C-alpha cells in the first residue's frame, strides 16, 4: 500500500535525521599552517586606516601587581586576572552540573580552560598576558540587575600601550570591551590581533545528541565544526566571520566583535576547545590610537539573552531546515509551561494540540486506508495475474482505483503534511535548554528511585522507550498490512528498530512520541468503533 511506503519513508527519514552527524559528517578540511589557535607570527595585511585618535602616553602608565578581580551578579560569578584580563572562573548561578540540589554550579571556565587564558589577546603572535606589563583600575564588582561596572586594564609593550575596558552587566551574560592600541613611537605600526576564548568540554564526550563544537557565523550563515579528531588538527574557515564560539545545545562561550571581517580558527588541545578571531592589518599611526569594540558571551543559549548580542548570535540555536516550525512550537511549549509548571505535562498538552490540529487530515488518512484495505484482495489478484507484466499490472490497478473512486495517495498526503511538524518539534525539544534538568515525574511510582527527573537525559530504566515500542507495534497491528511481502517484513521490524533508537533519546522526545502514538491509537480505535 502507498501509505505504508510513506510510513516507511517517515521512519527512515527520522533515522537519517538522528544519525545525520554519523552518516554524513561535514567534509574534512585539510589542516592549514595557521589553523591552530597559535601564538605564531604571521604577515599582516594592510587596510585603509581610519582617522587616528590620540595615543595613550607612556608617562600615564604605571604597572601594578597582578590581582584577581571578582565580579558578582544575579546571573553569574566571574573572576578576572588583571594581568592581561584573562578569565579564571565564570560560574552560572541558575544552572548546576546535575539535578542534585547540592551539585556544583556550571562553571564555563574551569581549571583546564583557565590554563589556556580565555579572553586573552594575542598581539602580533605574542600573548599579552605573558609579555606585557599591566596596570589595573578598580576592584571587585557587586552588580544588581540593571547595573553595570567596568574594569580598566592597561599594558605596555615597548612604545605600544594596550588598553582594555571590560564592562560587566547585572542582567546579561555579555562582557562588552573597548579595546585600544596606542603607538607612542615615531613610525606607524601594522598589527595582527587575535581575540580568543577557551572552554572545557560543555557536554559528555559520548553525547552524540549534544556535542561540544566550534561554531562560526558569517555572510553564508552558521558553520559548525565538530569531531574531536578534526578539531585536534585545527580548523580555519576561509570566509570572514562575524562571530566565533564554542557551544553545545545548551551553553555558549563566544567572541562577537563589532567588525565583521575577522578570520576564525579553532583547535582542541589538552582537552580544551579554543576559538580565535584574527584581525589583520590593524594600523596605528605614529602618535595615534586604534580602537575596536568587542562583545564576549558566556552563558546559556536562551534567546532573550543571545538577542542582546550583535551579529545574530541567536543564530547559534540551530533548528536546521525546520526552523520555521520549531520556533512557534517552542513558544507554545513555554505557553503551556507557564500554566502547568511542568515541562513534561507541557509536552503532552502540545502533542494533544498538534493532534487536534491535524485531526481532520488523520481522519481522511484512516478513511483512505480503510478503503485500500477493502481493495487488497483485488489488488493481490492483479499482482498475481500480471506478475510478469508490470506495466499492465499498474494500468489495471489504476483502473481499479478509478472504478471504486479510491485515491491510493489519500492516506499518504495527510502524513506528508505532518512530517515538517514532527521534525520541527524534534529539533525544538533537542535544543531547548528549558528541558535541561526539567522534571516530569521525579520518582518511579511506589519507589524512591529517580525517574524522568531530567527531560534532556535518557530514561534511566528504559521504561518509556519500551512502552513506546509496544504502542508502535499495536498501532501497526491496527493498520492494514502491505501487499508487498518484502515491505511487510520491513514494517514488522520498525517497532524494534525505533525502540532501540529511542533508548538513548532525551526522555522529553520519547514522551512526545509515546503520547503521539497513544493518541493515534485512540483515534484509530474510535474510527473503527464508529464504523462498526
From Swiss-Prot:
InterPro entries: Membr_insert_YidC (IPR019998), Membr_insert_YidC_N (IPR028053), YidC/ALB3/OXA1/COX18 (IPR001708), YidC/Oxa/ALB_C (IPR028055), YidC_ALB_C (IPR047196), YidC_periplasmic_sf (IPR038221). One of its GO terms (cellular component) is plasma membrane. Disulfide bonds: none annotated. It is a multi-pass membrane protein. Keywords: Cell inner membrane, Cell membrane, Chaperone, Membrane, Protein transport, Transmembrane, Transmembrane helix, Transport. One of its GO terms (molecular function) is membrane insertase activity. Interacts with the Sec translocase complex via SecD. Specifically interacts with transmembrane segments of nascent integral membrane proteins during membrane integration. Belongs to the OXA1/ALB3/YidC family. Type 1 subfamily. This is Membrane protein insertase YidC. It comes from Solidesulfovibrio magneticus (strain ATCC 700980 / DSM 13731 / RS-1) (Desulfovibrio magneticus). The gene is yidC.
Amino acid at each position: 500500500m502507498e501509505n505504508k511506503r510513506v510510513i516507511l519513508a517517515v521512519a527512515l527519514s527520522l533515522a537519517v535525521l538522528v544519525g545525520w552527524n554519523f552518516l554524513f559528517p561535514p567534509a574534512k578540511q585539510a589542516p592549514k599552517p595557521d589553523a591552530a589557535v597559535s601564538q605564531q607570527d604571521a604577515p599582516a595585511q594592510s587596510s585603509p586606516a581610519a582617522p587616528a585618535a590620540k595615543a595613550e602616553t607612556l608617562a600615564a602608565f604605571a604597572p601594578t601587581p597582578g590581582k584577581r578581580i571578582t565580579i558578582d551578579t544575579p546571573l553569574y560569578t566571574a573572576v578576572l586576572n588583571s594581568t592581561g584580563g584573562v578569565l579564571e572562573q565564570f560560574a552560572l548561578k541558575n544552572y548546576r552540573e546535575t539535578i542534585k540540589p547540592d551539585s556544583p554550579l556550571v562553571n564555563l571556565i574551569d581549571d583546564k580552560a583557565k590554563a589556556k587564558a580565555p579572553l586573552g589577546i594575542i598581539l602580533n603572535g605574542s600573548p599579552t598576558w605573558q609579555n606585557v606589563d599591566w596596570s589595573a583600575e578598580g576592584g571587585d564588582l557587586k552588580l544588581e540587575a540593571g547595573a553595570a561596572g567596568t574594569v580598566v586594564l592597561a599594558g605596555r609593550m615597548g612604545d605600544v600601550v594596550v588598553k582594555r575596558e571590560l564592562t560587566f552587566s547585572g542582567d546579561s551574560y555579555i562582557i562588552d570591551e573597548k579595546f585600544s592600541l596606542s603607538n607612542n613611537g615615531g613610525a606607524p605600526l601594522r598589527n595582527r590581533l587575535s581575540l580568543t576564548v577557551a572552554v572545557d568540554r560543555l557536554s559528555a564526550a559520548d553525547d552524540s545528541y549534544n556535542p561540544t563544537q566550534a561554531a562560526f557565523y558569517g555572510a553564508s550563515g552558521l558553520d559548525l565544526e565538530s569531531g574531536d579528531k578534526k578539531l585536534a588538527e585545527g580548523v580555519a574557515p576561509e570566509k570572514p566571520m562575524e562571530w566565533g564560539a564554542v557551544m553545545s545545545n545548551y551553553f555558549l562561550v563566544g567572541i562577537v566583535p563589532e567588525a565583521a571581517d575577522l578570520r576564525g580558527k579553532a583547535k582542541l588541545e589538552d582537552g580544551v576547545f579554543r576559538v580565535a578571531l584574527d584581525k589583520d592589518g590593524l594600523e596605528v599611526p605614529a602618535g595615534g590610537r586604534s580602537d575596536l569594540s568587542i562583545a564576549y558571551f558566556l552563558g546559556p543559549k536562551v534567546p532573550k539573552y543571545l538577542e542582546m548580542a550583535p551579529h545574530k548570535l541567536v543564530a547559534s540555536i540551530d533548528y536546521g531546515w525546520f526552523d520555521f516550525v520549531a520556533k512557534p512550537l517552542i513558544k507554545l511549549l513555554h505557553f503551556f509551561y507557564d500554566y502547568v509548571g511542568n515541562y513534561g505535562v507541557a509536552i503532552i498538552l502540545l502533542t494533544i494540540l498538534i493532534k487536534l490540529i491535524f485531526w481532520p487530515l488523520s481522519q481522511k488518512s484512516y478513511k483512505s486506508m480503510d478503503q485500500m484495505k477493502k481493495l487488497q484482495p483485488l489488488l493481490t489478484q492483479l499482482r498475481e495475474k500480471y506478475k510478469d507484466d508490470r506495466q499492465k499490472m499498474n494500468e489495471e490497478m489504476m483502473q481499479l482505483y478509478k472504478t471504486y473512486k479510491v485515491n491510493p495517495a489519500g492516506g499518504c498526503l495527510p502524513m506528508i503534511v505532518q512530517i515538517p511538524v514532527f521534525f520541527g518539534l524534534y529539533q525544538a525539544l533537542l535544543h531547548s535548554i528549558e528541558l535541561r534538568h526539567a522534571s516530569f515525574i521525579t520518582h518511579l511510582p511506589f519507589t524512591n528511585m529517580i525517574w524522568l527527573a531530567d527531560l534532556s537525559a535518557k530514561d534511566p530504566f528504559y521504561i518509556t522507550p519500551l512502552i513506546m515500542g509496544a504502542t508502535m507495534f499495536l498501532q501497526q497491528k491496527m493498520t492494514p498490512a502491505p501487499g508487498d511481502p518484502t515491505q511487510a517484513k520491513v514494517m514488522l521490524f520498525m517497532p524494534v528498530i525505533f525502540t532501540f533508537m529511542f533508548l538513548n533519546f532525551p526522555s522529553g522526545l520519547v514522551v512526545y512520541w509515546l503520547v503521539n502514538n497513544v493518541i493515534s491509537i485512540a483515534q484509530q480505535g474510535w474510527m473503527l468503533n464508529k464504523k462498526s
